[in-house]
């Protein structure tokens, strides 16, 4: 439309970008869920994701916006866990961290993976609010 002002053009462009991003995010979550369901290179849920982070296997860490969780880390090895019952290490060998999700983000980036923060996706919420597509 030739009569659109600059403000209207920007508003429409921004809306198109938001829509494209929402579609990309939905496709990414769908891919994650499908890979995990097939037993392929993906995991969902905090415990399995933290194990994959600890094993340095995460290619893409996918997190629901605002997801935080208390947990523990072995600073020497980088082992991260939210549930002490799943830890091969004793509690006194681990340092308490306020947010293991943030720790997982930092570890994933340091290991060359990338992180996607996803807003308002019910499939990801139902899968435990966190998942990872794995390198192997």
Give the label of every model feature segment.
Residues 1-136:
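Terminal alpha-helical anchor/extension segments at protein ends
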């Amino acid at each position: 439309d030739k009569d659109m002002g600059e403000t209207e053009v920007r508003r429409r462009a921004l809306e198109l970008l938001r829509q494209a991003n929402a579609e990309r995010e939905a496709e990414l979550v769908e891919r994650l869920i499908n890979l995990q369901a097939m037993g392929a290179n993906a995991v969902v849920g905090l415990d399995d994701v933290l194990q994959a982070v600890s094993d340095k296997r995460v290619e893409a860490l996918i997190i629901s916006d605002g997801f935080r969780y208390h947990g523990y880390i072995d600073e020497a090895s980088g082992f991260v866990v939210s549930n002490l019952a799943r830890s091969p290490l004793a509690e006194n060998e681990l340092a308490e961290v306020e947010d293991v999700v943030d720790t997982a983000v930092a570890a994933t980036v340091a290991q060359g993976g990338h992180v996607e923060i996803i807003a308002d996706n019910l499939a990801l919420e139902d899968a435990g609010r966190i998942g990872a597509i794995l390198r192997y």
